[in-house]
């Protein structure tokens, strides 16, 4: 799986950041890339759990042992944060969702410290 290319432009997320400034614009860009990769691979809709798996894998591919530091620097510290980003993107009409999609789909997905630091601890 190739790491997504990051195309960073602050103004792309200005409307979202005015409503919720918790996350760096690069976090939104990365999540959009994850959604794009996951949707293309699945050839359609991706569940919250599937999206979290893709998020973890692509973050590790892109940032390796720095993934945890990069994500937390962007304000993304939990799976619930990923869900908040996804639903902020939905509310800003950047992505679509199904009736069954919910922020609850992202609760308790995995432990960020364990998944992003664990593979690199001696």
Predicted regions and their residues:
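Non-transmembrane, aqueous-exposed alpha-helical and coiled segments at domain scale
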Residues: 2-122
């Amino acid at each position: 799986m190739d790491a997504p290319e990051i195309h960073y432009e602050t103004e792309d997320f200005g409307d979202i950041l005015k409503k919720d400034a918790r996350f760096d614009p690069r976090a939104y860009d990365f999540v959009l890339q994850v959604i794009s990769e996951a949707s293309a691979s699945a050839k359609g809709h991706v569940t919250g759990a599937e999206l979290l798996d893709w998020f973890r894998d692509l973050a590790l591919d892109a940032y390796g042992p720095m993934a945890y530091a990069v994500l937390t620097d962007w304000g993304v510290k939990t799976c619930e944060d990923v869900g908040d980003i996804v639903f902020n993107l939905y509310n800003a009409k950047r992505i679509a969702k199904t009736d069954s999609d919910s922020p609850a789909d992202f609760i308790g997905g995995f432990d960020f410290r364990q998944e992003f630091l664990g593979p690199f601890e001696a």
